[in-house]
Amino acid sequence: MSNALSIGKSALNAAQIGIATVGHNIANASTPGYNRQVMVQAAAQAQNFGYGYVGQGTNVVGIQRVFNETLSKQVINATATSNASNAYYSNISQVNGLLSDSTAGLNPVITSFFSAVSAAAANPSDTATRQTLISSAQSMVNRFNAVNTQLDQMRESINTQITSSVDAINSYSAQIATLNDTITKAVNSTGNMPNDLMDQRDQLVAKLSEQIKTTVIKQDDGSYNVFAGTGMPLVVGTQQYSLYTRASDTDPTRVEVAYGNAASPKILSTDTISGGTLGGVLQFRSETLDAVQNQVGQLAITLATQFNAQQTQGYDLNSVVGTDFFSVGSPTAISSAYNTDPTKTASASIVDASLLTSSDYTVKYNSGQYTITRLNDKSIMWQGTSLPATVDGMQIDVNTSTPAEGDSYLIKPTQYAAGKLALAFTNVDQLALAGSATTGPSDNENGLKLAALQNGANVRVAGSSTNRTYAQAFAQMVSAVGTKTNELSITSKADATALENATSAMQSESGVNLDEEATDLLRYQQAYQAAGKMMQIASQLFEVLLQLGQ
């Protein structure tokens, strides 16, 4: 009878554990990252009684979580890809809205300005038309300033997004390292996997992949080694490695991502960081925001510089040679923070606006010579032992005859130009519409030339062998941003669908199905009742034997 009682007890114990496991699944059906658990049973070692082997009941081998590593990796990859495209799309949509707005964009005010120039040229002696020209010019300047301000605000928003994302990455990786330690200790001490802790760790990995592309390599001791981007270690066993944010070496207003020694982490290139919100935001800044702000600045410089050049060829109402109508800021030159002598600076000036590009440039001194590189296509534009040098309509120089090895400078010809644009005067008499100092007030020779600038091939556009008009250059910029926005709209939706499908596939295997759990609950309940009945019968039989013995 003791054998029957023992078998019944093992069955009762298994049923109890099964009910507890199912109950745990039901309780966590809505818990993020929870993977359902199942009880694993095995028959107890049978005993040989001579006439054959008699079973000894059941053993509970363990509680196993249903987790598919392949599906999990698919979800992690899809999450990083989806968040990257979504972050890029949400940011570029703002730029697209800014540029394409028919009332807030640049094209209407440029058109209005040249219409006023034409009107003034048609009636050069009329003060009212001259005043209208001044007002239209001021409106155009204000619009350039406003667009640049909004782009600067987007740039500040990107800085905030980068900082927030890096903070989240460091928090998740620190928690993963802590769980690695706890899980490893639990496995070593009991030999069993702490399923709920492992779920928590996998959920943290999933959250980490929302911020950056994440790769996980499982170790023999149950710990995870986690790598980000193109292979930067974030977690190795119980050791966590942080990302940092720091100002760019050549632009203190630009937040960059750095890695390495906490005292002096090295700035990472955009190519090193991919996927997730952080990757998407950095890609948007480097591919779209920088390019658009530079192009807007290029348009402002080119229009203003060429208008000034023609204005100074004419004569005003007082028969005085015209002066610059627009105030145009000089290109910005920034010394690297790593330069040996910070007093050694670079400078740049525009010599031919029609040759100006929307790219930034670097000037580096190595092995006895300077190298000037155009950054948008990585082209080496000039090399020599001494400066100045003229590159793409711009003269570049340094203020030293004794450069140090490794000295580096960043030249930004156009990024800040739209924000610096202003009117140099507002006196209507100073508009130089006349072509000669001796002709009468009806002389409009120079006014007609100023108006003709609207349709001239004045702006250099990347990828084109011929220059474009101001309107064409702006339209091409708007079109490029619009095309990229539409592309990302489609891509982000496709990536979101891929993530949804990957998540559904994993949930169908690892998620809690309440209908299935209810069925299992009834099954274990019946097993529990049957085991109890078995023990009751065994007990009754034992009582009969005792009575027979008396």
Q: For each predicted feature, which ranges?
A:
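S/T-rich, low-complexity, solvent-exposed segments of bacterial secretion/appendage proteins
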Residues: 1-550
